[in-house]
From Swiss-Prot:
Name of the molecule in the record: 5'-nucleotidase SurE
Annotated residues for binding of a divalent metal cation: D8, D9, S39, N91
Catalytic reactions of this protein: a ribonucleoside 5'-phosphate + H2O = a ribonucleoside + phosphate
Family statement drawn from the similarity comment of this UniProt entry: Belongs to the SurE nucleotidase family.
Entry keyword Glycoprotein: no
Principal location: cytoplasm
Listed HAMAP family: SurE (MF_00060)
Gene Ontology terms, MF aspect: 3'-nucleotidase activity; 5'-nucleotidase activity; exopolyphosphatase activity; metal ion binding; nucleotide binding
Cofactor entry: a divalent metal cation
Length: 247
């Protein structure tokens, strides 16, 4: 397969380097990734400035842009090549539960889906970042499986890999997104109290059996199929009744 690779940690990050190394043996890869860290950029696109791809090597390009920018540009004319699959990652840190709303890694995969391609987002579920090689092997296994049994074009898989040696991985689990509590309070800068730092992610609120949190805690690779439709269908009738009461 011809695979477009991107991420939100930047084109030189260890995760994307490992991902490219893991997939290049059996697939044709092209890397189009941000020139620097763009974590938590979600699905933002750049409309107020033109974007300049810079070729680093034969199949690697960097852009001063978000992950969604990179995928969008690559698939909408810049590469002028037929791509079969979009893979983003390997992210440094988990993308579990509500994290997916903010994640540039997941957003890059979603952009691929918007543009008609099956897409996979892969994250190493730890801030230690010790076992990217494990995640690379898992990525290779998943992508090889996809190459034999194609995913539908509107599929996004959110994959989280425990940050452990491969021999500790118990297998794969298909999961749903868990949930976090509200984020921690913002923190004033120690040197300048007029500046604030965004607080840490909230603790796990829904981490029961079947969630991505539970899979990772028990050394399983979590694979969550994502959908783009954010409509809360079970509230449509309630909201309709509420609207009908407006005078």
């Amino acid at each position: 397969m011809k695979i477009l690779i991107s991420n939100d940690d930047g084109y030189q990050a260890p995760g994307i380097v490992q991902l490219a190394q893991s997939l290049t043996q059996e697939h044709e890869i092209i890397v189009v990734a941000p020139s620097e860290n763009k974590s938590a950029s979600s699905s933002s696109l750049t409309f107020d400035n033109p974007l300049r791809p810079i070729q680093i090597s034969n199949n690697v390009y960097k852009i001063d842009a978000t992950p969604s920018d990179c995928v969008h540009l690559a698939l909408c004319g810049f590469l002028n090549e037929k791509i079969d699959l979009v893979v983003t990652g390997i992210n440094f840190g988990a993308n579990l539960g509500d994290d997916v709303i903010y994640s540039g890694t997941v957003a890059g995969a979603i952009e691929g889906r918007f543009l008609g391609l099956p897409s996979v987002a892969i994250s190493l579920a730890s801030w230690k970042g010790q076992h990217f090689e494990t995640a690379g092997i898992i990525a290779k296994q998943l992508i090889n499986q996809i190459s034999h049994t194609q995913l539908s074009h509107d599929t996004v898989l959110n994959v989280n890999v425990p940050d452990v040696s491969l021999n500790y991985i118990k297998g794969f689990q298909t999961t749903r997104l868990g949930k976090r509590h509200m984020s921690e309070q913002s923190v004033a800068d120690k040197d300048d109290p007029t500046l604030y730092w965004i607080g840490e992610n909230g603790k796990e609120a829904d981490n029961g059996v079947g969630t991505d949190f539970h899979a990772i805690a028990n050394y399983y690779v979590s694979v969550t199929p994502l959908q783009i439709d954010l409509t809360k269908y079970n509230e449509i009738d309630t909201v309709s009744k509420w609207l009908n009461q407006i005078k």
